[in-house]
Amino acid sequence: MDRKKWCSGLVWALEFTLVFCVVTTVRAKNNSEKSASAGAASPLAGLGSISGTVKAPKEFKAAKVYVKNVDKNVVYMVFTEGGRYQAVDLFPGNYEVSVTKNGFTDSDVQKITIASGGTATADFTLKEGTYRPNQQMRSGLPKGEPLVSYDELYPPGHARETIERTCIMCHGPDFLPNKQWDESQWNAGIDLMQNPNDNAGARLVPGTFAAGEREELVAYLVKNFGPDSKKRGLAVPDEPIDEKALGKAMFIEYHIPPLPKGDRGFHDAHLSQNGDIWYVDARGLQVGKMDPRTATWTDYPVAGPQYRGHGLTQDASGDIWMAGHTAFVRVDSKTGEIKYYPYDTEAKRPPHGNTPFVDSKQNIWESLSWANEIAKWDRTTGEVSLYKTPTDNSFAYGMVMDKNDKVWLADWWRCKVTKFDPVDSQWIEYAPLTRPCTMRRVFADHNGMIWYALEWPGKIGMLDPNTNKIVEYALPLKWSFPYDIQQDHDLNYWIADSGQGGALIKFDQKSKNFTYYPYVQRTDMPKIEVSSENSIWYTTRSADPKDQALGVLYPDKSKIQTLAGSY
């Protein structure tokens, strides 16, 4: 099956303090000769490499080595294997190199220069430091807040059960403990979640609370997270480490230049026909492209906040289509000219476009989250048609089209997989095996199986549309929070997870094995894209605005043939 058709759019508190010191030696060699100590020069013309050793007074696995090109603001990250590391395909220029590993002090930052085609060596010796438990990745969390066990953070009881099926499913475990609200504020928050007139609709529908449950909930929140409480977070398990797999891998993050005014804030990215990576800067009201071969950026501002974007796709002619807040947004990829096609000029609230896809006839389809609809822009007529989803307040989020042009939706709030047949306008809803739940995205694999990711309770599932059979797989760590799932060309499945502070996870369906690749920085990844060479592209949505980046994971850096990204 042609991937371009179906991918077109696509932190127990344990702390101990020890004496620390870092001794680092750096030896730089700027030449193009192959060296056993420095590693082979990059196979890509004009690019360089760096390698070295990391030592410590006690055993460790998979330390993170950061190699930052300060000229282009590009960060490479690799993991040690047996105390050695290598980063390849580095742009020529000035670099800062450092090492981090939880339980050890961070190394000094070492400055080196890599010439075109050159190699360098940097060796590090770490000393013991402080171990900090892991924490889920959520925007706005204070850095370094105390982390405690679940029962300490949320004392057991019926009110906790209510929180689990309402608040935590979407917000995660660290949202409530960081509020310190009084009774009136907690009641106002619940009122907002129940307000049917809010732009996004009611998150908590009538019937969510049985008699007395809301009052019980508010009393619990005031007692545990009231004005006199302290900000705290949940200590979650560390990711399992497969050092052999991590030793092969390399991340690259391309950091976007700041705007003259205002903050950056990525949402989705999309690979393109010519290898550029297109992106949505939702906070900065931009759509744009980045050439990973040169790390150059081009922004195209949209006409206003009413066109703020979410997802992207590309049609056969090369035009980029963005799901805007109130309209289809069409960008000429060559000239940057932008056109807008409103979803519904009479809509009482913004429809909030989410995920776009192109069908076999080059019609553009989108999920409209706040309107609980899907929209179609007809290639022949230019007209826009709207189709209402069968369940109110479903919040149609991720969307995919299969090889037969059937539309598949992930209903975030009502947690269903919903199918729409454009031929007869018929809908079919499929409930996951595990409920209650929340679901962000769906994916159609090469066999037509529909995969979904359940943020809560941390599972992935597969629906066979031919038999209606559903199989689910629990992620191995509690408090996993899978967002998206995609398939690579070796038939592995890749999961974007923010549960342990952020990781990409490879799932082998045959062996049922999960391999974790911890992120470069703390973030979530709302959408991942797999290239024709099995590189995994993402955005750093919930990272600090100053650290917004387009990122890519190469599971095997020895197989990199190009820095470009196409399907």
Describe each region flagged by the PLM.
Residues 48-50, 56-71, 92, 144:
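Short, ordered, surface-exposed loop/turn motifs in non-cytosolic proteins
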Residues 277-283, 320-326, 364-370, 407-413, ...:
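Conserved beta-strand positions in repeat-built beta-propeller and related beta-rich domains
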Residues 525-567:
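Blade-level signature of beta-propeller repeat domains, shared across WD40, Kelch, NHL, RCC1
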Residues 163-174, 217:
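The canonical Cys-X-X-Cys-His
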Residues 69-84, 88:
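Short, acidic Ser/Thr/Gly-rich low-complexity loop/linker segments typical of extracellular
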Residues 260-274, 305-317, 346-361, 392-404, ...:
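Beta-rich, blade/repeat-based domains predominating
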Residues 93-103:
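A short, solvent-exposed beta-strand micro-motif common in secreted/extracellular proteins
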Residues 102-122, 127:
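Structured interaction patches on ligand/partner-binding surfaces of diverse proteins
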